[in-house]
């Protein structure tokens, strides 16, 4: 009874945008990539916010929490729709000692990650026409990591690059972001979630008591004591 009540309460919160809806999750973000409509990068803006003063009166910059399409839980190389990870987006490794960027690594991870990002997002955004998605698609098709190892904006990021998490905005209109809940990408994800059919047939859910599709797997559960930091299965 308690679990069912909690499940119903979560549904109420989701309807009122108090928690993430199905198909979306929260991600800490440090920077916003500003894209011109032709796909070139006009700026990379730090969007971190100053924390409340601690007991000594000191403050620090903290990432903002943003709702993005659900992040992948698959091991190995797998891109996200609206990617936030620098290696996937830019296809570059940063060397802290030399302060330089390179596409090279022993397993070609940078190249493989960037390709996975580009292929997945071009396929998903096919046919979309909004200015921000057009800019994003142009970026996907134009950005060549090998030609961008000395990009001024990335050079200025320096060591922050490796731990940064990104979102995308439209140059001249920072209020328009790729992940906006009323944007084409978010709407497509919501529609896909509604249209997904049964995976392994229907049965009675042990939590809700309602009849529905049976999931083959579930996402990793984070915060479980003594479990892997990336989440428990």
Question: Model-found features: residue ranges?
Answer:
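Conserved phosphate-interacting/catalytic interface
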Residues: 1-199, 203
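Short cysteine-rich clusters marking metal-coordination/redox-active sites
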Residues: 205-208
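Domain-exit/linker segments immediately C-terminal to small folded modules
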Residues: 210-233
């Amino acid at each position: 009874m308690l679990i069912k009540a909690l499940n119903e309460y979560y549904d109420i919160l989701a309807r009122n945008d108090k928690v993430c809806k199905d198909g979306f999750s929260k991600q800490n973000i440090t920077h916003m990539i500003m894209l011109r409509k032709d796909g070139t990068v006009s700026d990379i803006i730090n969007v971190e916010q100053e924390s409340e003063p601690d007991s000594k009166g000191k403050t620090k910059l903290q990432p903002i929490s943003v709702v993005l399409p659900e992040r992948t839980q698959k091991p190995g190389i797998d891109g996200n729709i609206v990617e936030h990870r620098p290696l996937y987006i830019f296809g570059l490794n940063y060397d802290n000692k030399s302060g330089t960027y390179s596409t090279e690594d022993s397993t070609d991870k940078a190249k493989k990650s960037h390709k996975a990002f580009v292929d997945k997002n071009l396929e998903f955004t096919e046919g979309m026409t909004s200015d921000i998605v057009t800019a994003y698609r142009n970026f996907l098709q134009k950005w060549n990591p090998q030609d961008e190892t000395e990009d001024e904006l990335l050079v200025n990021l320096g060591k922050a690059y490796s731990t940064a998490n990104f979102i995308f905005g439209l140059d001249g209109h920072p209020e328009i972001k790729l992940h906006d809940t009323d944007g084409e990408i978010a709407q497509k994800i919501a529609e896909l979630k509604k249209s997904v059919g049964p995976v392994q047939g229907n049965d009675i859910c042990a939590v809700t008591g309602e009849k529905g599709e049976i999931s083959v797997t579930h996402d990793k559960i984070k915060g479980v004591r003594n479990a892997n930091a990336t989440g428990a299965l």
